[in-house]
Amino acid sequence: MAARPPASLSYRTTGSTCLHPLSQLLGIPLDQVNFVACQLFALSAAFWFRIYLHPGKASPEVRHTLATILGIYFVVFCFGWYAVHLFVLVLMCYGVMVTASVSNIHRYSFFVAMGYLTICHISRIYIFHYGILTTDFSGPLMIVTQKITTLAFQVHDGLGRKAEDLSAEQHRLAVKAKPSLLEYLSYHLNFMSVIAGPCNNFKDYVAFIEGRHIHMKLLEVNWTQRGFQSLPEPSPMGAVIQKLCVTLMSLLLFLTLSKSFPVTFLIDDWFVHKANFLSRLWYLYVVMQAAKPKYYFAWTLADAVHNAAGFGFNGMDTDGKSRWDLLSNLNIWKIETATSFKMYLENWNIQTSTWLKCVCYERVPWYPTVLTFLLSALWHGVYPGYYFTFLTGVPVTLAARAVRNNYRHHFLSSKARKIAYDVVTWAVTQLAVSYTAAPFVMLAVEPTISLYKSVFFFLHIICLLIILFLPIKPHQPQRQSRSPNSVKKKAD
């Protein structure tokens, strides 16, 4: 069982202490103040980057260089000398990129990046005793690991595989030449994503730096105008303002709900020994709902930073309005109204789902669902609670798929039946996610077992019975069209 850090160490920071007076004034841990300050500075820098370093005014080399320098400054401000881990990993993997053969470049990069990340996860927990509440260097290291492995696989696709062996998406994203050192550093360490992500594709990033990003996306959706130079350049301001409003609301909800419904309530003596079964399920749902706004805040703010810089355009919707969701990491409305486990996971931590698809789900020849869950758990860290969550997610995913394939079609014959089905499946989905994700925030073995014992392991038992006794109706779409999000569990 992972040792929990002492309370006095749970919020310590390794970064700058210049905002310590503000931290004391607000009553918010310094590491979190540094994180938010860096993201707000990044937002300001993003506006400046889009206006004053527009591709029409600055060369790609200048944009790459400034994006990298700002990113390095922000990560050092937040994490101090621990930022060296990011620089070491990026430089090591660039060495792999330029020296390894294209037939093995993806394998070597994957094992070096994941190996280094795992060693850092172990050291920060078992040696340095950093708590889960500490905003430390492992977060950026996780994002960099995604980027390193994504790029390595895409270079392998572009240089080491035949075009006919690639799926349509792999062909679109294949990288046909190894990146220069400046491009590599900029892609991994740029100020927009180095603190909070998300992972993005190398071709999209380079197109953004070179000023081809928006035009490329418009041409992908067959935008018909007088020519390439006459294509419009939509403003991201509407999307940025909307996302900043969501960010502010998420922050207020987090500050309110996390204090009213702390995770520790799930191991409280009253909850475990005195509350009735239905009360336990209700409080489990409420506590897990209260834990979500912090993710909404961090991911939506990161999305706004990219959009403010002009990155994240994704074409036009059916009404002809600009879409700025290329790098969005979640869809809050679809999460909160999801009527299936699959739908929920498809809209949570979207870019990590895309990464899992790229490096695991579409690549492995056996047991893609199980191996994707295990990779996701390993990427998150070595707390036992992560593995409880992801291993619980496997039977829940399989059981949900079996129920849907066997019964859903019976409820589509009338509107009333469909509404009833949607209401029931919404309630079951939200409860199943809360049950499955609880160990993720509890971390250790003892509180996880205590929680599951208090609710009699009911979902584990139900899922196993469904898998054992419901007839299997195989659903076998093409490998390239399978979504990893249907097998990916809720991530941090």
Swiss-Prot record:
InterPro entries: LPLAT_7/PORCN-like, MBOAT_fam. The keyword Transmembrane helix applies. The gene is Mboat1. Acyltransferase which catalyzes the transfer of an acyl group from an acyl-CoA towards a lysophospholipid producing a phospholipid and participates in the reacylation step of the phospholipid remodeling pathway also known as the Lands cycle. Acts on lysophosphatidylserine (1-acyl-2-hydroxy-sn-glycero-3-phospho-L-serine or LPS) and lysophosphatidylethanolamine (1-acyl-sn-glycero-3-phosphoethanolamine or LPE), and to a lesser extend lysophosphatidylcholine. Prefers oleoyl-CoA as the acyl donor and 1-oleoyl-LPE as acceptor. May play a role in neurite outgrowth during neuronal differentiation. GO terms for cellular component: endoplasmic reticulum membrane. Its EC number is 2.3.1.-, 2.3.1.23, 2.3.1.n7, 2.3.1.n6. It is a multi-pass membrane protein. The active site is at N349, H380. It is an enzyme of class 2 (transferase). This is Membrane-bound glycerophospholipid O-acyltransferase 1. GO terms for molecular function: 1-acylglycerophosphocholine O-acyltransferase activity; 1-acylglycerophosphoethanolamine O-acyltransferase activity; 1-acylglycerophosphoserine O-acyltransferase activity. GO terms for biological process: phosphatidylethanolamine acyl-chain remodeling; phosphatidylserine acyl-chain remodeling; phospholipid biosynthetic process; regulation of neuron projection development. Highly expressed in stomach, epididymis, and colon.
